[in-house]
Amino acid sequence: MIKYIVKKLLLLIPVLIGITFLSFAMMRLAGGDAVTYMYENAGAAVSQEVIDDTRKEYGLDQPFLVQYAKWFTGMATGDMGMSYVSKRDVYDTFIEKLPATILLTLSSVLLTMLISIPLGILSAVKHNRLIDYLIRFFSFIGNSMPNFFAALVLMYFLSIRLGWFPVITTDNKALSLVLPTLTLAISMASKYTRQVRATILEELNKDYVKGARARGVRGSVIIWKNVMKSSMLTIITLLALSIGSLLGGTTIVETIFMWDGVGKMAVDAITMRDYPIIQAYVAWMAIIYVVVNLITDIIYHYLDPRVRLGGDQA
């Protein structure tokens, strides 16, 4: 166990180097000058000499590889640099935005599971009946709907027409959280309902279920004590995928609802060419996916000892 965890964490180093190097290179290849844009955005007319001095101050006059090496060394020691726009420490900025993203992640995942697991089970149990067709139909509609479209529809009906919730984030965090949570849950619950249904159907056709039915065991007992236990690995995989992607920040949803999380922070940084913020966001995405996958593997191992850490079957 310890050996496997150490191996996975060591794997994070080349992953971080590869991903951050590529993003570093792509930002430079995208063209434009961060310093020039910074002054233009501030509405300040400055001379070329001031621009050159600022570039030197930020180390942007140095060769690409030198810039990257300095940034990566700083990140490894906890120094992510300073934002070009806000002039604040990148680490402090990131920590400030992270709680909002964590809150949105937890609420969205919780609502998704509360919707998708019962509906997936109901659809499987009522296989090829009216309720099954209805659940599959609405799951298809929800899965086909882009997040931005769902956000605009919810915003129009629940905010503009009915006035139940604020259009964008306000000081009332509880009310402001509802629409972005619903937006994310619609898409995820639609997709996961279909996957839960497929998993439950597969389990219901296995011999141990048929044997339990033949012995007169009630259907609800079979579902909750036997089938659900065997389906937990699939559900955990869904949770891991959701948490990993959401903790990276749901850029579109956070931007539409002005939810002040790391996703919106990344969009603002890209717009402003705030390289240190962008690089910190990319590094965070890489770290969170490796860590979430590691935790998922460990949970797999404890739920089903036949699964060896490393992915092999015992």
Locate each region found by the language model.
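An internal, D/E-rich "acidic patch" concept
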Residues: L60-I117
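Hydrophobic alpha-helical transmembrane segments of multi-pass integral membrane proteins
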Residues: F21, L106-L110, F149-L154, A283
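Membrane-water interface segments at transmembrane-helix boundaries in multipass membrane proteins
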Residues: K87, R136-A198, T271
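Hydrophobic alpha-helical transmembrane segments of membrane transport/permease proteins
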Residues: L16-V66, G163-L179
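Cytoplasmic-entry segments and transmembrane alpha-helices of multi-pass inner-membrane transporters
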Residues: I2-K7, L11, P118-L154, L233
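Alpha-helical transmembrane segments of integral membrane proteins
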Residues: I2-K3, F94, L98-I131, T170-A314
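Transmembrane helix irregularities
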Residues: A30, G142-M145, L247
